[in-house]
Amino acid sequence: MKAKVIVGMSGGVDSSVAAWLLKEQGYQVEGLFMKNWEQDDHNDYCPAAKDLADAQAVCNQLRIPLHTVNFSKEYWDRVFAYFLSEYEKGRTPNPDVLCNKEIKFNAFLNYALTLGADYIATGHYAKNTIEGSIGYLFKAKDREKDQTYFLHAVEPEALSKTIFPIGDFTKPQIREFAKQLGLVTHAKKDSTGICFIGEKRFKTFLNEFILAKPGDIKSTGGKTLGQHDGLMFYTLGQRQGLGIGGLQNSTDEPWYVVDKDIASNTLYVAQGSQHPMLYSQGLICGPIHWLADYENHLPLTCFAKTRYRQTDQACMISPPDNNQHYVMFSNPQRAITPGQFIVFYEKNQCLGGATIEQIIR
């Protein structure tokens, strides 16, 4: 009998089709719906309840059982606490990376193993190869949807227990499969917003957990131009929501966030989308989480992304210095953001990644 695979069912189209593909391939397939956020229960509209209903409907259509599990405590302790602490430092974190590492490919994997699973599967756009107890990560066929950026922190051992059924298909193909099968999720729009929390108004949401400290908005020359609502609400390269248009003695060019000074609680801005302060020659990152055996081959010339869907950028990684690496780019990079992740690639293979600590102008 073929292996038992438990699919993480999110209530979306990708995981729905992933489950169907595995069933078609002869696996013993079961679904599992993870609830990772409790706060919605007190609102009039609860997206988690709708997602669970959709996941259940799909599993009924595919005639597979659906398990449910609540990982809210794990999510709060391992993902959300970090998310808040980073924002309190004035940085811009990416909770989806930690959510994959700690919840989907750790808590979920371990729970699935207790249910007798040989593998887990998800609806991520990615590919992997398995050699013994180690998994290697590769880009999906659909480069527009490729999610390896968000998966770079998953442990290689977890990747060896994972199947990515939709990695060889494009999003339009996945939607077409779902439509032909009559799955209730075939036209459901893609989820956006914070991992598992959904499309909340970000400012309002963050204000529930962190006390905002308003402060000065200054030009790079030190002139006070206005007031910000709290450094946590702004990210490098941001243009919207600054409220400083139409200043006397300034050009019509828009203003952009170019720096944050946490000590003085000051937001620095500059005019023009090509302002030199928006660009960096390189960055300093923390320890690299390697998914391939390259750590003994530094310095290394490869490619990298500093944000999702960015085109791969040529770079060189230095050997570690006090647990940090210098990464220098062949071309200046716009709006690199501390707290986000740099993810490294060699052709289609994801080599790993690290947290961006500082920019090098």
Swiss-Prot record:
Catalyzes the 2-thiolation of uridine at the wobble position (U34) of tRNA, leading to the formation of s(2)U34. Keywords: ATP-binding, Cytoplasm, Disulfide bond, Nucleotide-binding, RNA-binding, Transferase, tRNA processing, tRNA-binding. Residues 145-147, 307-308 are annotated as: Interaction with tRNA. SUPFAM superfamilies: Adenine nucleotide alpha hydrolases-like (SSF52402). It catalyses: S-sulfanyl-L-cysteinyl-[protein] + uridine(34) in tRNA + AH2 + ATP = 2-thiouridine(34) in tRNA + L-cysteinyl-[protein] + A + AMP + diphosphate + H(+). It is found in: Cytoplasm. Belongs to the MnmA/TRMU family. The record marks H124, Q340 as: Interaction with tRNA. It is an enzyme of class 2 (transferase). The active site is at C99 (nucleophile), C195 (cysteine persulfide intermediate). The keyword tRNA-binding applies. It holds the Pfam family tRNA_Me_trans_M. Its EC number is 2.8.1.13. The keyword Cell wall biogenesis/degradation does not apply. InterPro entries: MnmA-like (IPR004506), MnmA-like_C (IPR046885), MnmA-like_central (IPR046884), MnmA-like_central_sf (IPR023382), Rossmann-like_a/b/a_fold (IPR014729). GO terms for biological process: tRNA wobble position uridine thiolation. This is tRNA-specific 2-thiouridylase MnmA. GO terms for cellular component: cytoplasm. Disulfide bonds join C99-C195. Transmembrane segments: none annotated. NCBIfam families: PRK00143.1, trmU. It comes from the Bacteria. It comes from Legionella pneumophila (strain Lens).
